[in-house]
């Protein structure tokens, strides 16, 4: 990861200044920002032409970065989640009062993934917190896997692109309910 140190540091600086970045994930390029910065999230919603009602997925480098945003769940259910992490699996949890409404949208849950992607994980570690992870696309368009297309579509609309290899998955991550195990998106 030494080859990416400066790029990650630049991305973290951008995030701390309220910027919106693109970065590689397990499947596609993601667009993200500081989930606690309302202005940054509003900018991301504008860029994606996305309704605030939909909510966002958060990625983290470890559970403790996102645990305060969730209500406690049954230990067996939590163990099932932990069996898939770190990895390309997103789970919804009951949202705590700490979870901003602009992240949960119209839902009483919050969607979380502890990422296994080396750059995304390092980005969360260096940022010292979770990030929004939304597929790099505009509403209704397919997610972007190629940095050249990313630049064409988003150009100067985003503040920083952290280039790097994508993970081996070719579709956005599945989403499951952490309490029931129900598949919400394949």
From Swiss-Prot:
Origin species: Coxiella burnetii (strain RSA 493 / Nine Mile phase I)
UniProt keyword annotations, A-Z: ATP-binding, Cytoplasm, Nucleotide-binding, Nucleotidyltransferase, Transferase, tRNA processing
Signal peptide coordinates: none
Compartment(s) of residence: Cytoplasm
Protein purpose: Required for the formation of a threonylcarbamoyl group on adenosine at position 37 (t(6)A37) in tRNAs that read codons beginning with adenine. Catalyzes the conversion of L-threonine, HCO(3)(-)/CO(2) and ATP to give threonylcarbamoyl-AMP (TC-AMP) as the acyladenylate intermediate, with the release of diphosphate.
Enzyme Commission numbers on file: 2.7.7.87
Cysteine pairs bridged by disulfides in the record: none
Main location: cytoplasm
Domain YrdC-like: 5-186
Protein name (record): Threonylcarbamoyl-AMP synthase
Molecular functions per Gene Ontology: ATP binding; double-stranded RNA binding; L-threonylcarbamoyladenylate synthase; nucleotidyltransferase activity; tRNA binding
HAMAP family recorded: TsaC (MF_01852)
GO cellular component labels: cytoplasm
Swiss-Prot/TrEMBL catalytic activity: L-threonine + hydrogencarbonate + ATP = L-threonylcarbamoyladenylate + diphosphate + H2O
Enzyme class: transferase
Family: Belongs to the SUA5 family. TsaC subfamily.
A biological process from GO: tRNA threonylcarbamoyladenosine modification
